[in-house]
Amino acid sequence: MQIKTFALSAAIAQVATLALADTSANYWQSFTSQINPKNISIPSIEQTSSIDPTQECAYYTPDASLFTFNASEWPSIWEVATTNGMNESAEFLSVYNSIDWTKAPNISVRTLDANGNLDTTGYNTATDPDCWWTATTCTSPKISDINDDISKCPEPETWGLTYDDGPNCSHNAFYDYLQEQKLKASMFYIGSNVVDWPYGAMRGVVDGHHIASHTWSHPQMTTKTNQEVLAEFYYTQKAIKLATGLTPRYWRPPYGDIDDRVRWIASQLGLTAVIWNLDTDDWSAGVTTTVEAVEQSYSDYIAMGTNGTFANSGNIVLTHEINTTMSLAVENLPKIISAYKQVIDVATCYNISHPYFEDYEWTNVLNGTKSSATASGSATSASASGGATTAAAHIQASTSGAMSVLPNLALISAFIATLLF
């Protein structure tokens, strides 16, 4: 029955992907890109080949045959996505006006308290009318026609490998290590980082990672107006398409801050949220907490791979692609691989065959990651561990320096029935 349960979850995920395809006049088809995602050739320059952060993070002008960025057509980098007049541009207004805003949930824009934290004062956490994750960690919307957030991998003893905030200019050693270990992750890219470091985004696709959206400027999304929320989504989608030739169907809210208003707006662009059920808090190491505390979180979560915690389903773990966290990831990945049967990206763990709007089929498979990434025999295991140590040392230096078709519902029902019975 466990196999059937997973198969059902995967089937539902695939159906949901298809069901959200025809939204807002297929806005993504208006995006342009000079990139063929099935055949990307990244220029060999110091920034793409070096593992010295100083060289990696030196500004470069992208090859015009691959990536052309006209600043007048984009929001200001790292500012809310309606800046630079984008909320008044014909391009954005075309998408905004294609949405029937009378159907949007009547949920107020959230505010911050004096300390800059989301103010949950007065919110009814018992009834949680808005499915506000920040207040209650709710992942099942209270309104219809919106997908549930994805928050865990359905397959038992599975580590859902995800990294936020990329592409980071100093990620070469980290991506090299993932490639050596044949590990694929869900990479949640920030639009501003994509246009700053387009070759980094291209590498994510070349290496076979699942690319998803993490907004344009990394705001607390429930504090933004409807226009601002839509713009954060829209321009991140446009940026990822420009740099990679692909438009994601999945996104992750910064800080996990999402409610049914934000979900509804995301759904108008065919986007489904991916949350997590374990948080390493890795970004805070040496900032608001100690490195030792983050290492303990890793150790606790690694132990869960063998102590029965995930005997019936897996996890999705929040980690980050930033200067202070990539070395922690590399140090812990060999132990994660040893403790879990699967270490895989979200698209694979949910058996999502088309994680992008374009005709680009996902071919990563269950059980493929660990068998190829885990050493068989003590000698090879030692080699894998050594590789982790070497990569971590390099990364540590940076801390100091398609056409979519709606499914036939009768066929879907019949298929799910065969899984259940």
Curated annotation (Swiss-Prot):
Task: Say where the protein is mainly found.
Answer: secreted
Query: Which Pfam families does this chain map to?
Result: Polysacc_deac_1 (PF01522)
Say where the lipid (GPI-anchor amidated threonine) is covalently attached. Answer: 390
Domain of life of the source: Eukaryota
Q: Would you tell me the Gene Ontology cellular component terms?
A: extracellular region; plasma membrane; side of membrane
- Sites of glycosylation? 39, 70, 87, 106, 168, 307, 323, 351, 367
Q: Which reactions appear under catalytic activity for this entry?
A: [(1->4)-N-acetyl-beta-D-glucosaminyl](n) + n H2O = chitosan + n acetate
Where are the membrane-spanning stretches?
none
Cofactor annotation = Co(2+)
- State what this protein does: Hydrolyzes the N-acetamido groups of N-acetyl-D-glucosamine residues in chitin to form chitosan and acetate.
Recorded protein name is: Chitin deacetylase
